[in-house]
Amino acid sequence: MGISVPQVTVKILSTKLAESGPLLITHWGLSGPVILKLSAWGAKELAAFNYHFGIVVNWLHTYNESSLKASWSQLRKQYGSQKIGSRNPFALPGRLWNYFLHKCAISPEINWADLSAAQQSRLIKILTGQEFQVSGKTTFKEEFVTCGGIKLAEIDVNSMQSKIVPGLFFA
């Protein structure tokens, strides 16, 4: 079963493309509305990259790295005596929060107040800018990444009928 995150920001590296929205983590990889929007809007760029490119996921779309650093001392004060594994102040799904702790080599049993500066830095960085490499596309859902379509010059805009194939109408 996948994990859904209601609101993230995803940016395609080496482009100006970024979108915010719901993200789904599946056993296939990342999906959901934010990924599908990016693959639609960035179809030409993704094809030019031969579907090999990097993305950055900001799991806390309302923060960037510097704003989260600025808020961190307040979080430590507020949750200082609580175990970081059981106190997730960002409303992220539990399995995802535990993954971040593991990835940052942070024991879920450590109290918020006892996080080292290095641990804090790693956690802030992953929460606001985790990088992934995309290598290819799925064979289904190709319509989101292939730049297909019909030239407007080939459609009678009054009737929405094809000028090339009489009797073929578009909605």
Q: Where are the language model's segments positioned?
A:
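An anion/pyrophosphate-binding glycine-rich loop and adjacent beta-alpha core
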Residues: 1-114
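A glycine-rich dinucleotide-binding beta-alpha-beta segment and adjacent secondary-structure elements
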Residues: 99-171
